[in-house]
Structure formats: structure tokens, C-alpha cells
Amino acid sequence: MKKIGVVGIVITQKNKEEILAMQVVLGEFSDIIVGRMGIPREGINAIALIVEGTVERISALTGKLGKFENISVKSALAVTME
């Protein structure tokens, strides 16, 4: 069963290698990413992803992103899609 929700990503320290690796992960999960908004700030960046997929697939995305040292990830899933 699919859910729709938001994944919040906060990058606390810019590290080119980590950011490139994060982009690869996002590409791997592009099938569940409906929208993306990034807010660049000095010293910190925030990205909001709108996602639609199974809980398992969304959890796999947040799990991979959460392994990066300078990236914090939280998700909120709200609606069950039929």
C-alpha cells in the first residue's frame, strides 16, 4: 500500500563527495520522488522531498540518506493511497 509524505533533509556541512553521493541515492529513488525543493543557506542547506511509495521503499531512501555524516533526515508519512 502506498503512502504520500515528506522527507526533510538538512545538510549541516558542505562536503562535495557526500553531496554527490546523496545525488546518486536520490537518483536511485527517483521513482518515488514526486517533487523536490531546496533552500540554500550559508552554512546549512535544507531539502524537502515529496514522496509517494510503500513504507518499505521510503524507509530504504531515508535509511541510505541517514548514513551520511553531515546529513540529517526525517520523514512524515500522512496519507494512504489506494
Where are the model-predicted features located?
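Long, contiguous binding/interaction regions
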Residues: M1-E82
